[in-house]
Amino acid sequence: MCIRDSPWVEDASNEYIKRFGIDYALVLKMIKPAKRKEGRKIASLLIEEEQKIKAALPHRTRLVVMDETGRAMNSMAFAKLLQYWGQQSLDPCFIIGSADGVSENLKKQSTLLQLSEFSLPHGLAKVILIEQLYRAVSIIKGLPYHRS
């Protein structure tokens, strides 16, 4: 089974990724979700997905789960948070969970941030997150992209 984004998600994501330039590296990894089979409990699926996520993580990572219960913040606050993590030499790893979210254990080990109070399809959540990362970088670098 191949996991691919819709063409519009790839196009929009790539548009923002190319704007980052050489100062910031953005690495995207898509983890194949656990197979949803009749009789499997969601908790066991989420634990399997947690193991796959952790296996794909680099060292010295700050886990950030995008979650509906996470802290809401504006773009300026998000930029300050990214800047702080950079000063601490922590590479943030942003996680958008499967359709069932992420395991409670992974949530406990992570900073929880909210993209929106709306439920979003994964592709749109990905594009919004990448755009907000670019916006935060432009704020940090003093570029004119963000207007308060």
Where are these regions (language model features)?
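S-adenosyl-L-methionine/SAH cofactor-binding core of RNA-modifying enzymes
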Residues: 25-26, 32-93
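A short, Lys/Arg-enriched amphipathic alpha-helix followed by its capping loop at the start of a domain
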Residues: 12-23
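Structured adenosyl-cofactor binding patch, chiefly the S-adenosyl-L-methionine
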Residues: 104-147
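Short N-terminal binding/cap micro-motifs at the start of the first secondary-structure element
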Residues: 6-11
